[in-house]
Amino acid sequence: MGGDPDRFGVTIAAFHHANTQRAKRWPRSVVTTSTHDTKRGEDSRARLAVLSEIPQEWAAQVETWSRILRAGRGEIGITAPPDRNDEYLFYQLLLGSWPVEGHFNGTYIDRLKAAMTKSIREAKVHSTWQSPNREYEGAVLSFIDDVSNSDAFFSTFLPFADRIARLGVQNSLVQLTLKLTAPGVPDIYQGSELWDLSMVDPDNRRPVDYDHRIHLLDQCKRISLDHWQDGAIKLFMTQKLLHLKAEGSYEPILAEGQKTDCICAFARQDVMVLTALYPARREADPDWFDTRIPVPPHLLGMNLRNILSGAAVHQEDARIAAAEAFRDLPVAVLVGDLQ
């Protein structure tokens, strides 16, 4: 809800300008990434954002999947339902919501069918709530059943989905860090304390197992990207950053060196927030080379500690090496203590 296809993204400079204005004018405005009306869960969107880095590869995958599934149904070209747009929507839906445990079970299939039916009716092209087109909708649901039984499809889908999920986690952690440290009051929607891969509402209104979340938080003593699947890393970071309560002025920090466009950083009083962008690009070329992040003058001479990892971060010539800041995670939140 509230999205605009014409607003695909913003530059880092525009992001800093918006936050500077918010800190001055609307410091208590709500910052939210999921609501009861969200059309895709926040971590599903973080996965799909990876696709914008690899458009050619994504397009090739879509063509491959369509060819496999249409051939399996005895179809040549896009002649039978779903049409091209609805089929494309389905692949996005499947990729964004694909369960971490990888179970394509009956419950998940039912959720997919419900989401596709609602999307088709609200698009008002082939069907509507007032006048449902049962024939078209039935053909789409049959298509989903065929997907669930296609070994050829999953042989190409699963490796790609696993990669997008892994890279999407990095986007999720950046999104979470920005939400909890940028100016404004962060809003955490029920259930999104762990990975939120929900589909169109009301899929995002399913019961939440809070006992499981309490147990995870009690068990989590440190965070690592090596064990991201259970979502404990997101829950742990949420707790840490809420305790921090970054407030006060907003000071943009502009990185220096070869990969400046991959870093969004700012300071909130005695806190430095560093985030690494574009996970697919960084995976293809992981070397940070000479990229460094300047330390604001008021933090010089302080011991800087990453509250997420507990590690001390070294300053050299009033700068922090990006390779050190992002050694373990795509985010670092540094707190300064006087020496």
Feature locations, PLM:
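Carbohydrate-interacting/catalytic domains
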Residues: 1-339
